C-alpha cells in the first residue's frame, strides 16, 4: 500500500480507545463497522453453543477486525477482546468499500491480508491430520513467533519473546489440542530447550531450531 493511501486510511472513521479485557466486538452483534487496530493486541474468541470458548486468532496494529460480518452483512462470528490498551479507528463498511474502490492498492493489501488468514486456517486443518500433537503445538508457536515475536537483547537474534500473552488453554485452542495434551507438549518443548515458560509468558529460546523442529519454512508469509 502506498504511503499516501495508508495515511488516508488512518484518517478514516473515528478514533476510539479500549482498556485491557474490554470487548471491541461482540459475537452475535449485527453492527456494520470494521475496526482498524492502530496500537495494542487483541484476541478473537468464538463461543460454541456448548459454552466452550475457542481462541481463533491474535491481531495487532495494522490489522482489520470485524470485516467478515461487515462485508457479508451477517452477525458477528466471534468476540474481539483487548489484551492490552488498544487504539483503533471505527470505520463504517460503506465508507471502507468506497475507500477501497478509490484505492486499488488498498484493495490489494486487504486481499493479501485475507489470503494470509485463510492460509493460516488451512494449515491448521492440514496439521490436524499430518502431524502429531507435539509438532502441531510447535508449529503454532513457530508461526506466532514469525508474526509477533520481539527479539531479546541476550539472544543473538535467536532468542525472542513470543510477543503475545496466551494462556495454555488458548494455545491448545490454536493447535486443536486438549488442554492436558498441550500442557504435556509444552513441558516437552521446554525440556528440549526450545521454549521457556513463565506465567502467561513464553520465550522462544532458539527460533531457527524451533522452525526446524516444527517443519516451518523461515520465510512463512503469515
Regions found by a protein language model. Name each.
Residues 24-29:
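Short phosphate-coordinating micro-motif centered on Lys-Gly-acidic
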Residues 133, 144-222:
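Phosphate-/nucleic-acid-contacting segments
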Residues 57-120:
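Cyclic-nucleotide recognition modules
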Residues 21, 32-45, 60-62:
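Glycine- and acidic-residue-biased ligand/ion/polar-headgroup-sensing regions
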Residues 49-56:
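Short alpha-helix-to-loop micro-motif enriched in aromatics/charged/Gly
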Residues 1-22, 65, 69-70:
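Cyclic nucleotide-binding regulatory module and flanking cytosolic helices
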Residues 134-138:
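Short, leucine-enriched amphipathic alpha-helices that occur as contiguous helical runs
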Residues 41, 85-87, 201:
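Structural motif
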Amino acid at each position: 500500500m502506498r504511503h499516501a493511501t495508508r495515511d488516508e486510511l488512518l484518517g478514516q472513521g473515528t478514533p476510539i480507545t479500549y482498556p485491557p479485557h474490554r470487548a471491541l466486538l461482540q459475537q452475535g452483534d449485527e453492527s456494520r463497522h470494521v475496526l482498524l487496530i492502530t496500537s495494542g493486541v487483541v484476541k478473537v474468541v468464538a463461543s460454541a453453543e456448548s459454552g466452550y470458548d475457542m481462541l481463533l486468532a491474535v491481531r495487532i496494529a495494522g490489522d482489520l477486525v470485524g470485516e467478515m460480518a461487515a462485508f457479508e452483512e451477517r452477525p458477528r462470528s466471534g468476540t474481539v477482546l483487548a489484551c492490552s490498551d488498544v487504539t483503533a479507528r471505527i470505520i463504517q463498511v460503506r465508507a471502507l468499500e468506497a475507500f477501497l474502490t478509490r484505492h486499488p492498492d488498498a484493495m490489494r493489501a486487504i486481499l493479501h491480508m485475507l489470503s494470509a488468514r485463510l492460509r493460516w486456517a488451512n494449515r491448521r486443518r492440514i496439521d490436524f491430520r499430518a502431524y502429531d500433537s507435539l509438532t502441531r503445538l510447535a508449529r503454532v508457536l513457530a508461526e506466532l513467533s514469525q508474526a509477533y515475536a520481539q527479539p531479546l537483547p541476550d539472544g543473538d537474534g535467536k532468542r525472542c519473546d513470543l510477543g503475545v500473552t496466551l494462556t495454555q488453554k488458548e494455545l491448545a485452542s490454536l493447535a486443536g489440542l486438549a488442554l492436558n495434551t498441550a500442557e504435556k507438549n509444552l513441558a516437552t518443548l521446554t525440556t528440549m530447550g526450545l521454549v521457556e515458560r513463565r506465567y502467561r509468558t513464553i520465550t522462544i529460546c532458539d527460533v531457527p531450531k524451533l522452525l526446524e523442529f516444527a517443519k516451518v519454512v523461515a520465510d512463512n508469509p503469515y
